[in-house]
Curated annotation (Swiss-Prot):
Its EC number is 2.7.8.33. One of its GO terms (molecular function) is manganese ion binding. Catalyzes the transfer of the GlcNAc-1-phosphate moiety from UDP-GlcNAc onto the carrier lipid undecaprenyl phosphate (C55-P), yielding GlcNAc-pyrophosphoryl-undecaprenyl (GlcNAc-PP-C55). InterPro entries: ECA_WecA-rel (IPR012750), Glycosyl_transferase_4 (IPR000715). GO terms for biological process: cell wall macromolecule biosynthetic process; cell wall organization; enterobacterial common antigen biosynthetic process; lipopolysaccharide biosynthetic process; O antigen biosynthetic process. It is an enzyme of class 2 (transferase). Pathway: Bacterial outer membrane biogenesis; LPS O-antigen biosynthesis; Bacterial outer membrane biogenesis; enterobacterial common antigen biosynthesis. GO terms for cellular component: Gram-negative-bacterium-type cell wall; plasma membrane. The keyword Membrane applies. It is a multi-pass membrane protein. This is Undecaprenyl-phosphate alpha-N-acetylglucosaminyl 1-phosphate transferase. Signal peptide: none annotated.
Length: 365
């Protein structure tokens, strides 16, 4: 596939997803698939929860128009379709966490049993020897599926953030896969971005506040599952184009935020799934930034971490264990900042005041 053909297909996918969103939001309002404001959700009015359904429709359209051979795409669509359906039911009726976890385990088992996708190896992340998981890899894979889905679900807290972080992750994967000649998987990653961008435009209100939509659990579940599916295809096997440790950098911010949040909740004796306002975007907004500024800052941080992962992947002289050590160092720094969020917030507020004062003095002089 040449670049012109890929670009043309991506434009078609973008236009289809945009048109589908406008149609789907009207249907969602009629059937009650909307998000209502409450004590945790500060938006105004009823917002259609159709972002995830639109992304899934866009992916189906992408598979329909491309000539690329996507491995096990029928199984993926069946699993993803089930997750989107259950996610939409949860968006509409707020179903049990146990039911959602069971369905996530079900699609994870199908992915391993039918497609043969599971974590056989962690590569050379722990030294010069390869870390082969053997039968234990099936258990680790189920946990990875659950972790990826919930990591992306938990960052969906302010406008644009889930879409921005998703585009960073799929963009990094797409670049590495394209450079490795894996055109079908690269197209899949770029198609995900093409389906997500229309959602971002509407979610941020860039096409008018009255057209605003949310992703919903259907969308965050789909994005997390798609990310882990592609990463398993790209990091496992003898000729894998991406090292397993690079996957950590690609989804760094969602992963770090999820681990930090769950650790903090468990320490307080709370359920790890109980809602609160302690996510990274909440902490940044408490430091005096707007939700739009928090979205930009977090997305840029995710892009920086993903770029480090991409560079580490390309520079073959850097051992995988060094990349793991650097990631753990970045995670410790993240945890330190989150644990002392009030100090960080106070420092940022003081810095912003000094900058405003300096700017004011400059204008007066």
């Amino acid at each position: 596939m040449n670049l012109l053909t890929m670009s043309t297909e991506l434009i078609y996918i973008f236009l289809f997803s945009m048109a589908f969103l406008f149609v789907a939001r009207k249907v969602a309002i009629k059937i009650g698939l909307v998000d209502k404001p409450n004590y945790r959700k500060r938006h105004q009015g009823l917002i259609p929860l159709v972002g995830g359904i639109s992304v899934f429709a866009g992916v189906c359209f992408a598979f329909l128009i491309t000539n690329q051979q996507i491995p096990h795409f029928r199984l993926y669509l069946a699993c993803a379709g089930l997750l989107v359906f259950v996610g939409a039911l949860d968006d509409r009726f707020d179903i049990s966490v146990k039911i959602r976890a069971f369905v996530q385990a079900l699609v994870g088992i199908a992915m391993m049993a039918v497609a043969g996708l599971y974590l056989r190896s962690l590569g050379h992340a722990f030294g010069p020897w390869e870390m082969v998981l053997g039968p234990f890899g099936y258990v680790v894979t189920l946990f990875a599926v659950w972790a990826a889905i919930n990591a992306f679900n938990m960052v969906d807290g302010i406008d644009g953030l889930l879409g921005g972080l998703s585009c960073v992750s799929f963009g990094a994967m797409g670049i590495l896969l394209y450079q490795s000649g894996q055109m079908s998987l690269a197209l899949w990653c770029f198609a995900m971005i093409a389906t997500i961008i229309p959602y971002i435009l509407l979610n941020l209100g860039l096409l008018g506040r009255r057209y605003k939509v949310f992703m919903g659990d259907a969308g965050s579940t789909l994005i997390g599952f798609t990310a882990i599916w592609i990463l398993l295809q790209a990091t496992q096997g003898n000729a894998h184009p991406i090292n397993p440790v690079t996957a950590l950098w690609i989804i760094a911010i969602p992963l770090m935020d999820m681990i930090a949040i769950m650790y903090r909740r468990l320490r307080k004796g709370m359920s790890p799934f109980s809602p609160d306002r302690q996510h990274i975007h909440h902490l940044i907004m408490r430091a005096g930034f707007t939700s739009r500024q928090a979205f930009v800052l977090i997305t840029l941080a995710a892009a920086l971490l993903a770029m480090i992962g991409v560079i580490g992947e390309r520079l073959t002289f850097i051992p995988e264990w060094v990349m793991l050590a650097l990631f753990l160092l970045a995670f410790l720094l993240y945890g330190y900042c989150i644990k002392r969020a009030w100090r960080v917030a106070r420092f940022i507020k003081r810095f912003k005041r000094r900058m405003r004062r300096a700017s004011k003095n400059k204008h007066e002089s």
